[in-house]
Amino acid sequence: MKTLTSSKAFWLLLVICVVTILPFLGLSEYHTKGEPRESIVSYSMLDSGNWILPRNNGGEMAYKPPFFHWSIAAVSAAVNGGQVTEMTSRLPSAIALIAMTLCGFLFFAKRKGVELALLAAFITLTNFELHRAGANCRVDMVLTALTVGALYCLYKWYEKGLKGIPWLAILLMSCGTLTKGPVGTIIPCLVVGIFLLLRGVNFFKAFLLLSAWAILSLILPFCWYVAAYQQGGEEFLALVMEENFGRMTNTMSYNSCVNPWHYNFVTLFAGYVPWTLLVVLSLFSLTYHKFSIQPAAWWKRFTTWIKNMDPVDLFSFTSIVVIFVFYCIPQSKRSVYLMPIYPFIAYFLAKYLFYLVKKQSKVIKVYGSILAVISLLLFTCFIVLKCGLIPETIFQGRHAQDNINFMRAIQNISGAGALFLIAIPTILGIYWWFYQRKNALNNRFLYALVVLTMGLYLALDGAYQPAALNSKSVKFIATEIEKVAPESEGTMYEFIEESLHAAGDPVHYFELNFYLHNRLD
């Protein structure tokens, strides 16, 4: 890996990103309300020509600003003749993940070396939370990429001695605000502001400069908000206040993703699977020393550590802490809110893994062997299901039929492509056993772990997941409805009693409405 130049590593990373993400975006139909709720907004834009505040789902306004929906509409118009599909609706998220991964590589490669940056990029690409978000039609991955990109640009501005205007950072913050509201500007400015203070920059200088960049970044969003208010009036203004200020101050008229304070710790731990398993295992291989609890001494050591910390390390550490604490404040908590800290965690995790290799820690081989066993067990379970060795009668309870449908879907997987993808992690798992026996521990083992992880994702994304999730899809119901009430007959009406009493965020048949081309009222 030492002979790999930055340019070659970049193109290698790009190819791997494209090959492991893009081919599988359209295989799964919509199976939750979240994705079609966003994609139908883009459908309405293309259908009605209203790119400011289109109405959908029976007259409902979008709950988020339009940049993400513009992206879907633009992609759909460019590659699919203006037709919004599962694939085109997920493409902006995939592009955002790929772009963020590549930019992260370039950022750290320039400052910390190609080898460390490449491993950090692979870890970013293969943790569960980002991998899932990069294949979803939701605003969060695009917001994450814009936020992280703005942070990188503002750090580059810091390296230049705070001289000039960071136009790219301002543009990215503008797009972030147009994706999910003021948080797209607040987060980058808050993180960089605290970082500058820790680096000894005068408070008023940092505050005034970042305030100026924040104001500039809000010009484009302000234009949209004015145009949207002219269309939506007080109804739009009330929605904006609820979704932004109400969510942050815990004064929403309805409960939205309300979770306890420890929720963020749990979701961060789960979101970094499978790498969290490696970290947990490594804790048993470290050498620990006795220490005494002396608050004054610890605080002095901590402040000295911060003062002497490498600028890139401090910037990454500040990003993690500030964003994490920021999203602990509101009652509304979701795992995806924390995604902007994932690339910075990947950087520290990559450093830690190289440290483990340097110490010749056996945990690297142990973890790789666990992944190999999982790969082999996954294939074994597939063969067992394919042979019909598990009776459907073992499933009982309310979700019995869903589980039976999942099992039948896995049993019905066929086709050379799907079977080839299923075989990949199995082959890699077998190869791992020979590789780790014949070779002494070195840095190449870390990239072998990445390959094992990617092999599992290929099988899941290309074969297992589409089969299982499509068994939950209601697309076939929409097809049957079309036979009875074709599109030529016009609008259809839905009735959901729960929506009549909902304080906010009413329930709709989002999936059916998308597959029926926004005909439900």
Language-model segments: which ranges?
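Membrane-integral, polyisoprenol-dependent glycosyltransferases
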Residues: 1-365
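Membrane-embedded architecture of ER/inner-membrane glycosylation machinery
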Residues: 2, 167, 288-521
